[in-house]
Amino acid sequence: MTPLLLVTSPPLSVPAGKLLERYFPGSTLLVWDPACPQDKRRVHRRIMAGRWALSLSFYNDYIFSAAELAHLGCILNIHPALPSLRGRGYDTLPLIQRHTHFGVTLHLVDEQIDTGKIVEVERRAMPDAVEYPQFRTLTQQLSLSMLESLLQRTQALPAAELSGYWISRAQCCEARWSGDFLSSQGLSVLLRGLSEAEPNHPILEQLPEHLLLQPA
């Protein structure tokens, strides 16, 4: 059984892969590119061909099937937002809704999206007058910092405790998910509504075009 599997996506697949190799050389890195239609099948085949004691999902929206979950052991996901922001919109809603804080959430993965028990939360004050590109960079940096901390602590564990340690951490954590889940379609509807109600909203000029053109 391979100790670790890391499933991630661009744009953080390269730095995430380097961290994995630093702390767990020889572990399995799977990079899922949602822009490539065949990629999901490739990732699925690789997951079904192995078994892992501990699996990490990092900065990607890959949804694991029940069959895949059975091969992944204990699964941890680093969600690039606070528990109050479930689903998509983690790098846009805090700006649109003028949140005072942002953060990242480490949680166990189950068959639902962003419902697994929370292990820990990193929370930061929102900088003044921050714009979308800078905010996205901040969340990515904080996500990578949490990934490195996770790998450091896991490296210090005996092999037999790779999963049990993180499950026990989740049982002790008091943080809970809150708020409604926002899908990709829901985010598209929200952005279209914003462009109609406030066409001069500054974030509309900062967002990449593909977010604004997604079908509702």
What are these regions (language model features)?
Residues 12-16, 38-41:
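Short, charged/polar "capping" segments at the starts of alpha-helices
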Residues 26-41:
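A short beta-strand-loop structural module common to alpha/beta enzyme folds
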Residues 39-51:
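Short amphipathic alpha-helix with an adjacent loop that forms part of the alpha/beta core around
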